[in-house]
Every structure is written in C-alpha cells, then in structure tokens.
C-alpha cells in the first residue's frame, strides 16, 4: 500500500483535523530523515509508517479519553517506556493536544541519539512532552498510563518498572504472538 492509500485508511479510522494531519506528515518526513542517522524503526516498516506506527499509536487515544473522563477530568500522567522514534507517545501528544485533553506525557529512552531525536521532533512540531534520557527503572514517579512497544518480555518489564505502577495504573503494552504465554508467566507477580 502506498503512502496516499495508507493516509486514506488512517483518515477512515481516525477523524482528525487538517492541522493534526499536517503535523503527522511532518513527523513522518522527520522519521525518514532521522532513520539515516539512527535506527529509529525497523527498515521493513519504513514504507508503512501510517498504518504500522501512526494508526497503532492512535488506537490509544480512546483509552486516554476514557481514563481522563473516569478521573473526573484531571490531567493525566502518561509514560512511554522505550519510546524510540516516539511511538505511541508523540502521536498521542499530537492528537491529545488537538482534542484539548490535559495530559503530561513523558517519553523515556536510554539511547541518547533517540532522545535527541525526540527533542528535535518536539521543537519542530511544537508539541508538549518531556524527554528523559535514562532507563525507565531509574524514574521515581507513578503514572496513570504506561505504554511500551517492543521493549522486553512482560515479566521483565514488570520486574524492572514495578516502581512506576500504582494499583489504578493502566498498562498498555504492545505484545507479539506470544502474549498469552507472557501474561500467564507474569500472573505470578501481578494481578490482572
């Protein structure tokens, strides 16, 4: 599927403003440019950014909206662990800003080049989030929502990041084919 077709599918899935689409288009170009300097995303997904990365990330906006409403409208704190190229954190920042959802997004990545990339995206797009260049287990704060894509096994993630989670926290962890096995293995540590 070419870029125009991907954008059409994205627009069919998500009703977003022209301004949001402009920011996402600029973001796509910056990812492609940044990929030359630093491995931001898998090479095989470079031609599929709109569906593989943007649409995947945009799915979380519904969760963010629901948590925001259920919290009585308070500003949320979201942590994106191992943010890399900024999925889902940057996409959520763009979309939440457009919908005026009060959210403090923290993107954490231990890779300095990726953290610098995320800072440059923030300036270029004029979006609001915080970039932290360290390992997530070294962060001393609790979050309402915690996201991670392609970081580590569920058990390892929970062991390393238990200090970030409170009882009410919502974890959105993108997992692969073996997700059921990972959940069963992790049930010994956490109640689902």
Locations of regions flagged by a protein language model:
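Conserved active-site region of classical short-chain dehydrogenase/reductase
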Residues: 58, 90, 155
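Conserved SAM-binding loop of SAM-dependent methyltransferases across substrates and taxa
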Residues: 85-100
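The start of beta-strands in P-loop NTPase/AAA+ ATPase cores
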Residues: 75-76, 170
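Residue-level signal for inorganic ion chemistry
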Residues: 31, 92, 174-175
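Class I SAM-dependent transferase core
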Residues: 2-73, 79, 112-127
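Conserved S-adenosyl-L-methionine
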Residues: 80-84
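S-adenosylmethionine
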Residues: 96-106, 110-192
């Amino acid at each position: 599927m070419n870029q125009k077709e991907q954008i059409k599918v994205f627009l069919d899935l998500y009703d977003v403003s022209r301004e949001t689409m402009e920011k996402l288009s600029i973001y796509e170009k910056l990812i492609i440019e940044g990929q030359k300097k630093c491995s931001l995303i898998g090479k095989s997904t470079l031609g599929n950014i709109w569906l593989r990365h943007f649409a995947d990330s945009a799915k979380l906006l519904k969760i963010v909206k629901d948590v925001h409403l259920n919290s009585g409208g308070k500003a949320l704190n979201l942590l994106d662990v191992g943010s890399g190229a900024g999925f889902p954190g940057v996409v959520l920042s763009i979309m939440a800003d457009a919908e005026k959802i009060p959210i403090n997004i923290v993107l954490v990545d231990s890779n300095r080049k990726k953290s610098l990339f995320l800072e440059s995206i923030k300036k270029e797009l004029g979006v609001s989030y915080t970039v932290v260049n360290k390992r997530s287990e070294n962060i001393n704060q609790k979050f309402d929502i915690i996201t991670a894509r392609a970081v580590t096994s569920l058990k390892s993630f929970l062991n390393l990041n238990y200090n970030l989670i409170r009882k009410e926290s919502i974890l959105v962890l993108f997992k692969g084919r073996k997700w059921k096995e990972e959940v069963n293995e992790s049930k010994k540590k956490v109640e689902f």
